[in-house]
Amino acid sequence: MAGQAGSLQGRVAFITGAARGQGRSHAVRLAAEGADIIACDICAPVSASVTYAPASPEDLDETARLVEDQGRKALTRVLDVRDDAALRELVADGMEQFGRLDVVVANAGVLSWGRVWELTDEQWDTVIGVNLTGTWRTLRATVPAMIEAGNGGSIVVVSSSAGLKATPGNGHYSASKHGLTALTNTLAIELGEYGIRVNSIHPYSVETPMIEPEAMMEIFARHPSFVHSFPPMPVQPNGFMTADEVADVVAWLAGDGSGTLTGTQIPVDKGALKY
């Protein structure tokens, strides 16, 4: 499913949560296909309820360096996707610098653990605020620029396998990701007349800091039945897939080779959701 070399030549991509993990892989992969990159990340703790270490401004600088190593330009900004004004300012700055916007990868997201009735308000508000509301704010800021550019384009919403199934132990995360599925499909219809495609991807077990194996194992130890909702991947029974493998799918969706697809949900799961 990898894009063809140079398949995004001359295009511009906007990527959230780009300082490390999947977001960095998406930025570098799209740059390798020829796109200039507008990238942002909060680069700071989101909430005390999110216990894994946050990305840093230096991480975002490294993403920019890796993009530039591909011979492409990078415009980066430290911002919170919950901050509407900051998002709009970055989009405006990107349009001023590059003159167009062709691809949006709404990737920013956070995760915490707990049973539904035991979640704190802070856990709920943080996960829903970043994953669902933050994605909506990203789309609200970028879609007018894509329409104005008049080149059609592709929006890739990074959901999760949790957006297609139940995930005991993080129901708030699952709710946010199911919400992205509805948002994706509605937007696909609304943007059809502008030639802009909208699809969601649903990765499973990707090696990023968000995985936080210790926290996951702790909740499985306390509630052993939950583990049945997290099966092994048939073609990779052990370990996690890499962020670069997910980026291959994003590159394909960003380019013209996936031009027949809009309003689709693509599991990036190596078969795990078939259990």
Swiss-Prot record:
Binding residues annotated for NAD(+), in chain numbering: 20-22, 41-42, 80-81, 107, 177, 206-208
InterPro entries: NAD(P)-bd_dom_sf (IPR036291), Sc_DH/Rdtase_CS (IPR020904), SDR_fam (IPR002347), SDR_subfam_1 (IPR023985)
Protein name: Uncharacterized NAD-dependent oxidoreductase MAP_4146
PROSITE patterns the record matches: ADH_SHORT (PS00061)
The enzyme's E.C. designation: 1.-.-.-
PANTHER family: DEHYDROGENASES, SHORT CHAIN, ESTRADIOL 17-BETA-DEHYDROGENASE 8-RELATED
Pfam families the record matches: adh_short_C2 (PF13561)
Record GO terms (molecular function): oxidoreductase activity
